[in-house]
Swiss-Prot record:
Catalyzes the reversible oxidation of 3-phospho-D-glycerate to 3-phosphonooxypyruvate, the first step of the phosphorylated L-serine biosynthesis pathway. Also catalyzes the reversible oxidation of 2-hydroxyglutarate to 2-oxoglutarate. Residues 16-26 have a biased composition (Polar residues). Belongs to the D-isomer specific 2-hydroxyacid dehydrogenase family. Residues 396-466 form the ACT domain. It catalyses: (2R)-3-phosphoglycerate + NAD(+) = 3-phosphooxypyruvate + NADH + H(+); (R)-2-hydroxyglutarate + NAD(+) = 2-oxoglutarate + NADH + H(+). This is Putative D-3-phosphoglycerate dehydrogenase. Pathway: Amino-acid biosynthesis; L-serine biosynthesis; L-serine from 3-phospho-D-glycerate: step 1/3. One of its GO terms (cellular component) is cytosol. One of its GO terms (biological process) is L-serine biosynthetic process.
Amino acid sequence: MDIKGGRRGNVEDSLNKLSLSPPDNNSSFLSNHFQVRKSYSQAPARTLKPFASEDIKILLLENVNQSALSNLKDEGYQVEFLKTSMSEDDLVEKIKGVHAIGIRSKTRLTRRVLEAADSLIVIGCFCIGTNQVDLDFAAERGIAVFNSPYANSRSVAELVIGYIISLARQVGDRSLELHRGEWNKVSSGCWEIRGKTLGIIGYGHIGSQLSVLAEAMGLHVVYYDILPIMPLGSAKQLSSLPELLHRADFVSLHVPASPETKNMISSKEFAAMKEGSYLINASRGTVVDIPALVDASKSGKIAGAAIDVYPSEPAGNGKDKFVDSLNSWTSELTHCKNIILTPHIGGSTEEAQYNIGIEVSEALTRYINEGNSIGAVNFPEVSLRSLTEADRNAARVLFVHRNVPGVLRQVNELFIDHNIKSQFSDSRGDIAYLVADISDCTPGSLEALHQKLESLPCKINTRLLY
Protein backbone atom coordinates (compact mmCIF):
# COMPACT_ATOMS: atom_id res chain seq x y z
CA MET A 1 0.00 0.00 0.00
CA ASP A 2 1.03 3.61 -0.24
CA ILE A 3 0.52 4.42 3.42
CA LYS A 4 3.57 4.71 5.60
CA GLY A 5 3.65 1.98 8.18
CA GLY A 6 1.60 -0.50 6.12
CA ARG A 7 2.78 -4.04 5.50
CA ARG A 8 5.10 -4.61 2.59
CA GLY A 9 4.29 -7.22 0.00
CA ASN A 10 5.08 -8.31 -3.50
CA VAL A 11 3.89 -5.72 -6.02
CA GLU A 12 3.37 -8.18 -8.86
CA ASP A 13 1.38 -10.56 -6.66
CA SER A 14 -0.86 -7.71 -5.58
CA LEU A 15 -1.48 -6.53 -9.13
CA ASN A 16 -2.31 -10.06 -10.22
CA LYS A 17 -4.96 -10.25 -7.52
CA LEU A 18 -6.98 -7.34 -8.88
CA SER A 19 -10.55 -8.41 -9.61
CA LEU A 20 -14.12 -7.22 -9.43
CA SER A 21 -14.41 -8.64 -5.92
CA PRO A 22 -12.94 -7.09 -2.77
CA PRO A 23 -9.71 -8.80 -1.68
CA ASP A 24 -9.72 -11.07 1.32
CA ASN A 25 -7.74 -10.15 4.41
CA ASN A 26 -4.96 -12.61 3.56
CA SER A 27 -4.15 -11.14 0.15
CA SER A 28 -0.65 -9.93 -0.56
CA PHE A 29 -0.26 -6.19 -0.46
CA LEU A 30 1.56 -3.61 -2.48
CA SER A 31 4.62 -2.07 -0.96
CA ASN A 32 3.93 0.46 1.75
CA HIS A 33 4.08 3.31 -0.75
CA PHE A 34 1.49 1.88 -3.18
CA GLN A 35 -2.28 1.69 -3.29
CA VAL A 36 -4.44 -0.37 -5.61
CA ARG A 37 -7.84 0.78 -6.77
CA LYS A 38 -10.79 -1.62 -6.89
CA SER A 39 -12.58 -1.87 -10.22
CA TYR A 40 -16.34 -1.88 -10.59
CA SER A 41 -17.74 -3.01 -13.92
CA GLN A 42 -20.97 -1.07 -13.47
CA ALA A 43 -19.18 2.32 -13.33
CA PRO A 44 -17.18 3.85 -16.18
CA ALA A 45 -14.87 5.72 -13.80
CA ARG A 46 -12.28 3.85 -11.78
CA THR A 47 -12.09 4.98 -8.17
CA LEU A 48 -8.62 4.96 -6.69
CA LYS A 49 -8.79 3.00 -3.45
CA PRO A 50 -6.38 1.13 -1.20
CA PHE A 51 -5.98 -2.51 -2.12
CA ALA A 52 -6.18 -3.42 1.57
CA SER A 53 -8.12 -0.51 3.01
CA GLU A 54 -8.33 -2.15 6.42
CA ASP A 55 -4.64 -1.33 6.78
CA ILE A 56 -5.44 2.40 6.73
CA LYS A 57 -5.79 3.52 10.32
CA ILE A 58 -8.00 6.50 11.15
CA LEU A 59 -8.40 8.05 14.60
CA LEU A 60 -11.54 10.09 15.31
CA LEU A 61 -11.63 12.16 18.50
CA GLU A 62 -14.11 14.42 20.31
CA ASN A 63 -17.27 12.49 19.47
CA VAL A 64 -17.22 13.30 15.77
CA ASN A 65 -20.66 12.74 14.25
CA GLN A 66 -21.65 9.19 13.36
CA SER A 67 -22.10 10.22 9.72
CA ALA A 68 -18.31 10.50 9.46
CA LEU A 69 -17.75 7.19 11.22
CA SER A 70 -20.16 5.42 8.86
CA ASN A 71 -18.63 7.00 5.76
CA LEU A 72 -15.09 6.02 6.69
CA LYS A 73 -16.02 2.49 7.75
CA ASP A 74 -17.84 2.04 4.45
CA GLU A 75 -14.49 2.66 2.76
CA GLY A 76 -13.09 -0.32 4.65
CA TYR A 77 -10.72 1.73 6.79
CA GLN A 78 -9.74 0.71 10.30
CA VAL A 79 -11.42 3.44 12.38
CA GLU A 80 -10.94 4.07 16.11
CA PHE A 81 -13.59 6.35 17.61
CA LEU A 82 -13.22 8.22 20.91
CA LYS A 83 -15.74 10.59 22.50
CA THR A 84 -13.14 12.80 24.18
CA SER A 85 -10.14 14.86 23.22
CA MET A 86 -6.63 13.84 24.27
CA SER A 87 -3.78 15.60 26.01
CA GLU A 88 -0.62 16.33 24.09
CA ASP A 89 1.32 13.63 25.94
CA ASP A 90 -1.33 10.99 25.26
CA LEU A 91 -1.70 12.01 21.65
CA VAL A 92 2.04 11.79 21.02
CA GLU A 93 1.77 8.06 21.74
CA LYS A 94 -1.65 7.48 20.21
CA ILE A 95 -0.94 9.09 16.85
CA LYS A 96 1.90 6.73 15.93
CA GLY A 97 0.89 4.56 13.00
CA VAL A 98 -2.21 6.67 12.30
CA HIS A 99 -2.71 7.72 8.66
CA ALA A 100 -5.60 10.14 9.16
CA ILE A 101 -6.96 11.90 12.24
CA GLY A 102 -10.28 13.65 12.76
CA ILE A 103 -10.68 16.28 15.49
CA ARG A 104 -12.93 19.14 16.52
CA SER A 105 -11.92 22.31 18.36
CA LYS A 106 -10.46 20.95 21.62
CA THR A 107 -7.65 18.69 20.38
CA ARG A 108 -4.36 20.48 19.74
CA LEU A 109 -2.18 19.10 16.97
CA THR A 110 1.04 20.84 17.92
CA ARG A 111 4.46 20.57 16.33
CA ARG A 112 5.40 17.99 18.96
CA VAL A 113 2.37 15.85 18.14
CA LEU A 114 2.96 16.10 14.39
CA GLU A 115 6.62 15.15 14.81
CA ALA A 116 5.44 11.93 16.45
CA ALA A 117 2.96 11.24 13.64
CA ASP A 118 5.14 8.87 11.66
CA SER A 119 2.41 7.78 9.22
CA LEU A 120 0.05 10.75 9.10
CA ILE A 121 -0.91 12.06 5.65
CA VAL A 122 -4.11 13.99 6.31
CA ILE A 123 -6.01 15.80 9.09
CA GLY A 124 -9.74 16.46 9.19
CA CYS A 125 -11.03 19.32 11.36
CA PHE A 126 -14.74 18.62 11.89
CA CYS A 127 -15.47 22.31 12.44
CA ILE A 128 -14.77 25.65 10.79
CA GLY A 129 -11.66 26.67 12.73
CA THR A 130 -8.21 25.22 12.16
CA ASN A 131 -6.20 27.27 14.66
CA GLN A 132 -5.90 24.14 16.84
CA VAL A 133 -3.52 22.69 14.23
CA ASP A 134 0.02 23.86 13.48
CA LEU A 135 -0.85 24.35 9.81
CA ASP A 136 2.58 25.46 8.62
CA PHE A 137 4.40 22.54 10.19
CA ALA A 138 1.76 20.13 8.92
CA ALA A 139 2.42 21.41 5.39
CA GLU A 140 6.16 21.02 5.91
CA ARG A 141 5.49 17.37 6.74
CA GLY A 142 3.35 16.91 3.63
CA ILE A 143 0.16 16.60 5.70
CA ALA A 144 -2.98 18.14 4.17
CA VAL A 145 -5.57 19.70 6.50
CA PHE A 146 -9.28 19.91 5.67
CA ASN A 147 -12.11 21.63 7.53
CA SER A 148 -15.82 22.33 7.10
CA PRO A 149 -16.25 25.99 6.17
CA TYR A 150 -19.92 25.81 5.19
CA ALA A 151 -21.87 23.10 7.00
CA ASN A 152 -22.65 24.92 10.26
CA SER A 153 -23.27 28.41 8.85
CA ARG A 154 -27.04 28.24 9.26
CA SER A 155 -26.82 26.96 12.83
CA VAL A 156 -24.54 29.80 13.91
CA ALA A 157 -26.66 32.41 12.14
CA GLU A 158 -29.83 31.15 13.84
CA LEU A 159 -28.13 31.23 17.25
CA VAL A 160 -27.13 34.86 16.70
CA ILE A 161 -30.74 35.75 15.90
CA GLY A 162 -31.67 34.12 19.19
CA TYR A 163 -29.02 36.19 20.97
CA ILE A 164 -30.33 39.43 19.44
CA ILE A 165 -33.88 38.83 20.65
CA SER A 166 -32.76 37.55 24.06
CA LEU A 167 -30.48 40.54 24.66
CA ALA A 168 -33.08 43.06 23.57
CA ARG A 169 -35.62 41.55 25.98
CA GLN A 170 -33.12 40.71 28.78
CA VAL A 171 -34.28 37.09 28.63
CA GLY A 172 -31.09 35.74 30.18
CA ASP A 173 -31.37 37.82 33.34
CA ARG A 174 -35.12 37.23 33.73
CA SER A 175 -34.57 33.48 33.42
CA LEU A 176 -31.81 33.44 36.05
CA GLU A 177 -33.98 35.50 38.42
CA LEU A 178 -36.92 33.16 38.08
CA HIS A 179 -34.69 30.13 38.65
CA ARG A 180 -33.82 31.77 41.98
CA GLY A 181 -37.51 32.30 42.77
CA GLU A 182 -37.53 36.03 41.98
CA TRP A 183 -40.44 37.46 39.96
CA ASN A 184 -39.26 40.57 38.10
CA LYS A 185 -41.68 41.60 35.34
CA VAL A 186 -40.20 44.78 33.82
CA SER A 187 -40.24 46.57 30.47
CA SER A 188 -37.57 49.19 31.15
CA GLY A 189 -34.62 48.70 28.80
CA CYS A 190 -36.43 46.02 26.79
CA TRP A 191 -36.94 46.56 23.07
CA GLU A 192 -38.36 45.13 19.89
CA ILE A 193 -35.68 44.40 17.32
CA ARG A 194 -37.76 45.65 14.38
CA GLY A 195 -36.25 48.79 12.94
CA LYS A 196 -32.95 48.43 14.80
CA THR A 197 -29.60 48.21 13.00
CA LEU A 198 -27.44 45.09 12.98
CA GLY A 199 -23.76 45.60 12.17
CA ILE A 200 -22.02 42.46 10.90
CA ILE A 201 -18.23 42.34 11.01
CA GLY A 202 -17.13 39.73 8.47
CA TYR A 203 -19.59 39.11 5.63
CA GLY A 204 -18.64 35.53 4.78
CA HIS A 205 -20.76 32.38 4.83
CA ILE A 206 -22.16 32.98 8.31
CA GLY A 207 -22.32 36.76 8.15
CA SER A 208 -24.23 36.76 4.88
CA GLN A 209 -26.74 34.15 6.09
CA LEU A 210 -27.25 36.15 9.27
CA SER A 211 -27.87 39.20 7.10
CA VAL A 212 -30.77 37.50 5.30
CA LEU A 213 -32.35 36.20 8.51
CA ALA A 214 -32.00 39.57 10.23
CA GLU A 215 -33.71 41.46 7.41
CA ALA A 216 -36.58 38.98 7.56
CA MET A 217 -36.97 39.95 11.24
CA GLY A 218 -37.20 43.65 10.35
CA LEU A 219 -33.62 44.67 11.16
CA HIS A 220 -31.61 47.05 9.01
CA VAL A 221 -28.25 45.47 8.15
CA VAL A 222 -24.87 47.08 7.59
CA TYR A 223 -21.61 45.19 7.36
CA TYR A 224 -17.86 45.69 7.27
CA ASP A 225 -15.41 43.38 5.53
CA ILE A 226 -11.83 43.84 4.40
CA LEU A 227 -12.94 42.75 0.91
CA PRO A 228 -15.62 44.33 -1.26
CA ILE A 229 -18.51 41.85 -1.16
CA MET A 230 -21.83 42.09 -2.95
CA PRO A 231 -24.63 42.40 -0.38
CA LEU A 232 -27.60 40.10 -0.07
CA GLY A 233 -30.98 41.78 0.16
CA SER A 234 -30.87 45.40 1.27
CA ALA A 235 -27.70 45.14 3.38
CA LYS A 236 -25.12 47.90 2.93
CA GLN A 237 -21.35 47.57 3.11
CA LEU A 238 -19.59 50.28 5.12
CA SER A 239 -16.07 51.48 4.43
CA SER A 240 -14.71 51.32 7.97
CA LEU A 241 -15.11 49.51 11.27
CA PRO A 242 -15.57 52.73 13.31
CA GLU A 243 -18.48 53.73 11.07
CA LEU A 244 -20.19 50.40 11.70
CA LEU A 245 -19.64 50.60 15.46
CA HIS A 246 -21.09 54.12 15.51
CA ARG A 247 -24.26 53.12 13.61
CA ALA A 248 -25.14 49.64 14.88
CA ASP A 249 -27.50 48.78 17.72
CA PHE A 250 -26.24 45.18 17.61
CA VAL A 251 -22.67 44.30 16.58
CA SER A 252 -22.03 40.67 15.58
CA LEU A 253 -18.54 39.31 14.90
CA HIS A 254 -17.86 36.70 12.22
CA VAL A 255 -14.11 36.77 11.58
CA PRO A 256 -11.33 34.16 11.79
CA ALA A 257 -8.67 33.98 14.48
CA SER A 258 -5.53 35.70 13.21
CA PRO A 259 -2.94 38.20 14.42
CA GLU A 260 -4.96 40.92 12.65
CA THR A 261 -8.20 40.06 14.49
CA LYS A 262 -6.76 39.50 17.97
CA ASN A 263 -8.53 41.88 20.38
CA MET A 264 -10.03 43.74 17.42
CA ILE A 265 -12.83 44.78 19.79
CA SER A 266 -11.17 46.42 22.79
CA SER A 267 -11.54 49.63 24.82
CA LYS A 268 -11.20 51.91 21.79
CA GLU A 269 -13.87 50.04 19.86
CA PHE A 270 -16.28 49.89 22.82
CA ALA A 271 -15.90 53.66 23.16
CA ALA A 272 -16.90 54.02 19.50
CA MET A 273 -20.08 51.95 19.91
CA LYS A 274 -23.50 53.51 20.44
CA GLU A 275 -24.66 54.04 24.00
CA GLY A 276 -26.80 51.08 25.05
CA SER A 277 -25.77 48.86 22.14
CA TYR A 278 -25.04 45.14 22.25
CA LEU A 279 -22.06 42.97 21.26
CA ILE A 280 -22.26 39.37 20.01
CA ASN A 281 -19.24 37.13 19.47
CA ALA A 282 -19.82 33.68 18.01
CA SER A 283 -16.62 33.66 15.95
CA ARG A 284 -13.31 33.18 17.78
CA GLY A 285 -12.39 33.70 21.41
CA THR A 286 -9.37 35.89 20.73
CA VAL A 287 -11.36 38.53 18.84
CA VAL A 288 -12.81 40.35 21.88
CA ASP A 289 -10.80 41.82 24.75
CA ILE A 290 -12.92 40.42 27.59
CA PRO A 291 -11.65 42.75 30.37
CA ALA A 292 -12.58 45.68 28.11
CA LEU A 293 -16.00 44.10 27.63
CA VAL A 294 -16.45 43.83 31.40
CA ASP A 295 -15.56 47.51 31.79
CA ALA A 296 -17.99 48.51 29.03
CA SER A 297 -20.75 46.49 30.69
CA LYS A 298 -20.16 47.86 34.19
CA SER A 299 -20.02 51.45 32.92
CA GLY A 300 -23.29 51.06 31.04
CA LYS A 301 -21.67 51.80 27.69
CA ILE A 302 -23.18 48.60 26.31
CA ALA A 303 -26.54 47.22 27.39
CA GLY A 304 -25.51 43.60 27.03
CA ALA A 305 -23.47 41.01 25.21
CA ALA A 306 -23.61 37.39 24.08
CA ILE A 307 -20.38 35.41 24.09
CA ASP A 308 -20.06 31.87 22.74
CA VAL A 309 -16.27 31.60 22.40
CA TYR A 310 -13.36 32.33 24.74
CA PRO A 311 -9.56 32.68 24.60
CA SER A 312 -9.19 29.51 26.67
CA GLU A 313 -11.87 26.83 26.75
CA PRO A 314 -12.17 23.62 28.79
CA ALA A 315 -11.07 20.40 27.12
CA GLY A 316 -14.33 18.68 28.07
CA ASN A 317 -17.73 19.07 29.69
CA GLY A 318 -18.31 19.06 33.44
CA LYS A 319 -18.77 21.16 36.55
CA ASP A 320 -16.19 23.70 37.74
CA LYS A 321 -14.65 24.00 34.28
CA PHE A 322 -15.36 27.66 33.48
CA VAL A 323 -13.39 29.21 36.33
CA ASP A 324 -10.76 31.89 36.97
CA SER A 325 -7.94 29.39 36.59
CA LEU A 326 -8.99 29.02 32.95
CA ASN A 327 -9.40 32.75 32.28
CA SER A 328 -8.54 35.24 35.03
CA TRP A 329 -11.59 37.43 34.33
CA THR A 330 -14.21 34.64 34.45
CA SER A 331 -15.81 35.63 37.78
CA GLU A 332 -16.12 39.27 36.76
CA LEU A 333 -17.71 38.33 33.45
CA THR A 334 -20.28 36.00 35.01
CA HIS A 335 -21.46 38.76 37.38
CA CYS A 336 -22.18 41.30 34.63
CA LYS A 337 -25.81 42.12 33.85
CA ASN A 338 -27.46 40.96 30.62
CA ILE A 339 -24.44 38.97 29.51
CA ILE A 340 -25.40 35.69 27.82
CA LEU A 341 -22.64 33.07 28.06
CA THR A 342 -22.81 29.83 26.11
CA PRO A 343 -20.18 27.04 25.84
CA HIS A 344 -19.16 27.30 22.17
CA ILE A 345 -22.42 25.88 20.83
CA GLY A 346 -22.65 27.88 17.61
CA GLY A 347 -22.41 24.80 15.40
CA SER A 348 -23.86 22.38 17.92
CA THR A 349 -27.00 21.22 16.18
CA GLU A 350 -27.80 17.76 14.89
CA GLU A 351 -28.08 19.10 11.34
CA ALA A 352 -24.77 20.94 11.40
CA GLN A 353 -22.82 18.07 12.93
CA TYR A 354 -24.28 15.56 10.48
CA ASN A 355 -23.36 17.75 7.51
CA ILE A 356 -19.89 18.44 8.91
CA GLY A 357 -19.35 14.71 9.31
CA ILE A 358 -20.25 14.10 5.69
CA GLU A 359 -18.26 17.04 4.32
CA VAL A 360 -14.99 16.34 6.12
CA SER A 361 -15.07 12.54 5.83
CA GLU A 362 -15.59 12.84 2.08
CA ALA A 363 -12.64 15.24 1.85
CA LEU A 364 -10.46 12.74 3.75
CA THR A 365 -11.57 9.90 1.49
CA ARG A 366 -10.90 11.87 -1.69
CA TYR A 367 -7.40 12.73 -0.51
CA ILE A 368 -6.55 9.21 0.65
CA ASN A 369 -8.01 7.45 -2.38
CA GLU A 370 -7.36 9.94 -5.18
CA GLY A 371 -4.89 12.54 -3.92
CA ASN A 372 -7.53 15.27 -4.39
CA SER A 373 -6.52 18.24 -2.22
CA ILE A 374 -9.29 20.67 -3.23
CA GLY A 375 -10.44 22.48 -0.09
CA ALA A 376 -7.23 21.95 1.90
CA VAL A 377 -6.48 24.96 4.11
CA ASN A 378 -2.69 24.60 4.26
CA PHE A 379 -1.84 22.83 1.06
CA PRO A 380 -1.76 23.40 -2.71
CA GLU A 381 -5.17 22.55 -4.18
CA VAL A 382 -4.86 19.98 -6.96
CA SER A 383 -7.32 17.61 -8.59
CA LEU A 384 -7.26 15.39 -11.68
CA ARG A 385 -10.17 13.66 -13.38
CA SER A 386 -10.89 10.11 -12.34
CA LEU A 387 -9.18 7.34 -14.25
CA THR A 388 -11.52 5.27 -16.40
CA GLU A 389 -11.94 1.57 -17.08
CA ALA A 390 -9.80 2.05 -20.17
CA ASP A 391 -6.84 3.06 -17.98
CA ARG A 392 -5.91 -0.51 -17.06
CA ASN A 393 -2.17 0.08 -16.85
CA ALA A 394 -2.20 3.60 -15.44
CA ALA A 395 -0.93 4.81 -12.09
CA ARG A 396 -1.30 8.09 -10.24
CA VAL A 397 1.79 9.79 -8.82
CA LEU A 398 1.33 12.06 -5.79
CA PHE A 399 4.50 13.99 -5.03
CA VAL A 400 4.73 16.63 -2.29
CA HIS A 401 7.96 18.58 -2.50
CA ARG A 402 9.69 21.77 -1.56
CA ASN A 403 8.85 24.65 -3.88
CA VAL A 404 12.25 25.13 -5.51
CA PRO A 405 13.28 25.57 -9.17
CA GLY A 406 13.88 22.55 -11.38
CA VAL A 407 11.69 19.97 -9.64
CA LEU A 408 9.25 19.44 -12.52
CA ARG A 409 12.14 18.86 -14.89
CA GLN A 410 13.64 16.28 -12.55
CA VAL A 411 10.32 14.49 -12.05
CA ASN A 412 9.41 14.46 -15.74
CA GLU A 413 12.80 12.99 -16.56
CA LEU A 414 11.87 10.09 -14.29
CA PHE A 415 8.68 9.59 -16.33
CA ILE A 416 10.71 8.93 -19.48
CA ASP A 417 9.54 5.31 -19.76
CA HIS A 418 5.87 6.24 -19.26
CA ASN A 419 3.25 8.18 -21.15
CA ILE A 420 1.99 11.14 -19.11
CA LYS A 421 -1.80 11.06 -19.48
CA SER A 422 -2.44 14.14 -17.35
CA GLN A 423 -0.49 16.27 -14.91
CA PHE A 424 -1.17 19.18 -12.59
CA SER A 425 1.11 21.01 -10.20
CA ASP A 426 0.47 23.85 -7.78
CA SER A 427 2.33 25.51 -4.94
CA ARG A 428 1.50 27.30 -1.73
CA GLY A 429 4.35 29.09 -0.03
CA ASP A 430 7.29 26.75 0.35
CA ILE A 431 5.26 23.62 -0.47
CA ALA A 432 4.37 22.27 -3.91
CA TYR A 433 2.20 19.33 -4.93
CA LEU A 434 2.38 17.40 -8.19
CA VAL A 435 -0.29 14.94 -9.32
CA ALA A 436 0.31 12.99 -12.51
CA ASP A 437 -1.38 10.04 -14.20
CA ILE A 438 1.06 7.88 -16.14
CA SER A 439 0.44 4.81 -18.30
CA ASP A 440 2.49 1.85 -19.52
CA CYS A 441 3.07 0.83 -15.91
CA THR A 442 4.43 -2.49 -14.69
CA PRO A 443 5.11 -3.54 -11.11
CA GLY A 444 8.82 -3.33 -11.69
CA SER A 445 8.71 0.12 -13.27
CA LEU A 446 6.57 1.46 -10.42
CA GLU A 447 8.98 0.14 -7.81
CA ALA A 448 11.87 1.78 -9.63
CA LEU A 449 9.97 5.04 -10.10
CA HIS A 450 9.08 5.20 -6.44
CA GLN A 451 12.68 4.71 -5.38
CA LYS A 452 13.86 7.45 -7.73
CA LEU A 453 11.22 9.92 -6.51
CA GLU A 454 12.13 9.17 -2.91
CA SER A 455 15.78 9.93 -3.66
CA LEU A 456 15.11 13.47 -4.92
CA PRO A 457 16.46 16.01 -2.39
CA CYS A 458 13.33 18.16 -2.70
CA LYS A 459 11.01 15.29 -1.71
CA ILE A 460 8.63 15.66 1.25
CA ASN A 461 6.17 12.85 0.62
CA THR A 462 5.62 10.36 -2.19
CA ARG A 463 2.60 8.17 -2.88
CA LEU A 464 1.71 6.04 -5.89
CA LEU A 465 -1.89 5.01 -6.46
CA TYR A 466 -2.53 2.06 -8.74
